[in-house]
């Protein structure tokens, strides 16, 4: 082998290459100043374990493939990787690990515990992703860094002073376990088996009994109205009357409202403050009084059931109703219960003072802006629009937790108990719960006591400006003004469209009056082999390194691309990884063959067969590049696998081996050079095309051949000289396959001579010499022979 290429590919070279890439600065962001810049707004993953699972890692591999492609296209790519270290995930994890409750531990001690837990995971987390060959620029300053938090606070200060953020006391979804407010997207729904309880109310004016069905009898003391559908003839007579609510006997109005479903229960519905967002809407619409009976810890705080938690109160009230003969019947049913997205505790709606970002009044403008973003695939735009349309409440962004960005807010408490909020100007990172107030805050509080706000931001308030951070907004290479918003791409899963994507859009509009980024690339969820989501509780999480150690990173990346259709879920499939390993071997062996020849210095006169494979390459490459430009890696790997293995290796290489070696001197020197030149041309260009997906084997070979990295090469558009008709090549493939099948049927070795004359169509005659010497037949002629050997009637022999 002229270029000293070893006989076999060795997986151990992958880790050596990672070190080489790091030493050569492949992972470091470089801004040249004279090349286009493109930003990948990499999703900062929650750091809740020392490794991501393989499904999550596959999506990051997709982003890496896009970054590598763009670099080879002459683009300065900002592809950062940092961790989302804020918020409930790490707090809940620390609480569980040490069997503590955050609110019962000194704040500074709890923050230190959270940081130490995060630090213990981060190094291995990053290194495990790097083992897949991910070429991100690792930024150790995650969302909990002073740098990031100062940026978050700066945007809050801007929005506060411009009137887009306000504080108000209002009903808010609340997690009793986490003791914090939640936004709409932070609520999940889980199926729960319960009872529909049929309970007797009395009509105050007539004394008659009416029956109301509810799954939440614990909210009877919080009931403020009873409604029925305006068209329900059974209850029209009750309009304007009042109901006496058991067990505490409060009197509430009976009113018509279209929210009542005549087919559910008895058709009469109790409205409580608050059972769900429907109750909240109706209470606001009808201006009903508010009776809050559940406190921040999820316990009853008024009446005879004071001190009981929600479940205990439900059981006690049911028992009391039964004793009083007011529970008519119970029907078992399964319904969806809103729960906290992190700890899965059922959510209550209570009245608290929170900070809100305006969003409901902006819905029409946000829908208009959603149309400006380029979605890949486009159907996911509608999911975003549908979510915007569904919004009914402004976004509560304050949280009563610890490990998150502090709200830069102080209160001037007057002697009469009134409180005035003071928000300083930006410029540094503020921690009002422990820091002394800045001078401007002191100067603004006359005749009052200054108190620092102890609350923190919803973690989405931080994450929703990741596109600013990724653009170097706080870095030395701040290119925000050059790239915003036209040269930023957000890659993310469809599962966080209503959170990360939506909040990013809202924040961009409020801060800049525009979209946050031009491109939105949506990927599906990584599933196990049975098509189920991977969860520790299910025991089906697949370690991201196990298949890498067994088959190599290129093989696993092959699966990630081959399974990763844009917008669709993708299953783990070890068989596809095995195919990837075989493909690595094929790429290696192709390279060994091509590199066994000296590369021609100049382009010779090509044969028709050579021009045909180049035309097929042109056609394939054009589709591959178009797909890459659409941030798609699924189509490129399938196209390139088919072309490299089945077109180039199986057919073209086999067809021109005799001509390239020319051991018998039957071909002219120019014909021989044409074969070798074409072998090199197709090999080099196809390797550049597949290098973003399979970076290890391609780079190793390239370094043997040329002494440099393939990832620093330029990937130009396919040469216009290659454009042409490749039907000759398709025809030759059919002829080759027909002869090989014939030899198999006859038990003849594929390398053995075949003492026949081969007859082919006239259009195949330009390949006659290559066909003759490849298949070792006596001659190749135009026409029909005695014995047809293929189903189409193209190939016959005599």
What are these regions (language model features)?
Residues 34-42, 65, 100-101, 126-131, ...:
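Active-site-adjacent bridging/hinge elements
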Residues 142-149, 561, 607-611:
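Non-catalytic interaction-recognition regions
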Residues 59, 93-98, 183-184, 229-230, ...:
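Short secondary-structure boundary/capping segments
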Residues 54-68, 74-75, 83-84, 150-151, ...:
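Structured ligand/cofactor/substrate-binding pocket environments in proteins
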């Amino acid at each position: 082998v002229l270029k000293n290429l070893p006989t076999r590919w060795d997986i151990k070279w992958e880790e050596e290459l990672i070190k080489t890439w790091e030493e050569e600065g492949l992972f470091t962001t470089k801004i040249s100043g004279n090349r286009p810049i493109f930003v990948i707004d990499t999703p900062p993953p929650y750091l809740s374990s020392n490794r991501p699972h393989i499904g999550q890692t596959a999506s990051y591999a997709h982003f890496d493939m896009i970054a590598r492609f763009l670099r080879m296209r002459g683009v300065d790519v900002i592809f950062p990787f940092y961790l989302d270290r804020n918020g409930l995930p790490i707090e809940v994890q620390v609480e569980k690990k040490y069997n503590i409750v955050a609110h019962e531990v000194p704040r500074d001690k709890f923050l230190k515990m959270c940081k130490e837990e995060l630090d213990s995971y981060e190094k291995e987390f990053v290194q495990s992703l790097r083992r897949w060959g991910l070429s991100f620029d690792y930024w150790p300053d995650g969302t909990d860094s002073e740098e990031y938090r100062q940026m978050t606070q700066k945007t809050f200060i801007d929005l506060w002073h411009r009137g887009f953020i306000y504080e108000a006391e209002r009903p808010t979804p609340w997690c009793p376990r986490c003791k914090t407010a939640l936004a709409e997207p932070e609520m999940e729904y889980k199926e729960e088996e319960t009872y529909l309880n049929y309970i007797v109310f009395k009509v105050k004016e007539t004394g008659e009994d009416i029956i109301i069905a509810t799954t939440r009898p614990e909210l009877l003391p919080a009931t403020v109205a009873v409604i029925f559908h305006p068209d329900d003839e059974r209850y029209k007579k009750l309009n304007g009357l009042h109901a006496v609510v058991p067990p505490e006997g409060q009197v509430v109005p009976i009113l018509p409202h279209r929210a009542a479903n005549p087919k559910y229960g008895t058709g009469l519905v109790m409205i409580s403050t608050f059972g769900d967002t429907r109750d909240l809407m109706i209470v606001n619409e009808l201006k009903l009084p508010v009776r809050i009976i559940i406190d921040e810890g999820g316990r009853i705080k008024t009446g005879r059931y004071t001190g009981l938690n929600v479940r205990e109160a439900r059981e006690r009230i049911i028992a009391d109703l039964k004793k009083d003969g007011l529970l008519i019947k119970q029907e078992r049913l399964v319904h969806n219960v809103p729960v906290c997205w992190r700890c899965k505790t059922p959510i209550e709606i209570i009245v608290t003072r929170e900070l809100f970002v305006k969003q409901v009044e902006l819905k029409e403008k946000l829908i208009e802006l959603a149309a400006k973003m380029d979605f890949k695939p486009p159907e996911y735009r509608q999911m975003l629009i549908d979510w915007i349309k569904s919004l009914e409440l402004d976004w509560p962004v304050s949280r009563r937790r610890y490990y998150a960005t502090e709200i830069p807010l102080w209160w001037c408490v007057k002697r009469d108990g009134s409180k005035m909020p003071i928000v300083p100007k930006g410029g540094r990172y503020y921690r009002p719960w422990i820091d002394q107030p800045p001078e401007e805050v002191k100067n603004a509080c006359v005749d009052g006591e200054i108190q620092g706000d102890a609350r923190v931001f919803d973690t989405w308030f931080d994450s929703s400006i990741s596109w600013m951070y990724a653009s170097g907004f706080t870095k030395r290479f701040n290119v925000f003004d050059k790239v915003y918003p036209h040269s930023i791409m957000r890659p993310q899963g469809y599962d966080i469209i209503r959170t990360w994507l939506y909040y990013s859009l809202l924040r961009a509009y409020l801060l800049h009056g525009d979209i946050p980024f031009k491109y939105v690339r949506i990927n599906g969820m990584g599933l196990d082999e049975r098509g189920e989501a991977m969860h520790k509780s299910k025991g089906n999480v697949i370690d991201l390194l196990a298949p890498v150690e067994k088959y190599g990173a290129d093989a696993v990346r092959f699966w990630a691309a081959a399974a990763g259709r844009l917008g669709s879920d993708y299953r783990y499939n070890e068989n596809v990884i095995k195919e990837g390993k075989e493909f690595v071997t094929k790429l290696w062996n192709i390279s060994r063959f091509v590199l066994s020849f000296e590369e021609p210095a100049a382009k010779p006169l090509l044969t028709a067969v050579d021009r045909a494979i180049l035309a097929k390459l042109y056609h394939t490459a054009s589709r591959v590049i178009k797909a890459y430009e659409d941030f798609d890696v699924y189509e490129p790997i399938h196209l390139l696998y088919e072309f490299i293995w089945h077109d180039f290796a199986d057919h073209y290489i086999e067809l021109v081996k005799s001509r390239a070696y020319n051991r018998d001197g039957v071909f002219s020197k120019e014909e021989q050079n044409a074969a070798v030149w074409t072998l090199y041309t197709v090999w080099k260009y196809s390797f550049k095309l597949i290098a973003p997906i399979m970076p290890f084997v391609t780079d190793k070979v390239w370094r043997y051949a040329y002494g440099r990295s393939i990832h620093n090469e330029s990937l130009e558009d396919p040469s216009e000289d290659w454009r042409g008709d490749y039907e000759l090549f398709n025809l030759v493939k059919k002829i080759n396959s027909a002869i090989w099948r014939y030899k198999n049927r006859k038990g003849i070795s594929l390398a053995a001579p075949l003492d026949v004359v081969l007859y082919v169509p006239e259009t195949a005659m330009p390949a006659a010499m290559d066909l003759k010497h490849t298949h070792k037949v006596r001659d190749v002629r135009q026409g029909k022979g005695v014995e047809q050997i293929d189903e189409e009637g193209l190939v016959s022999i005599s």
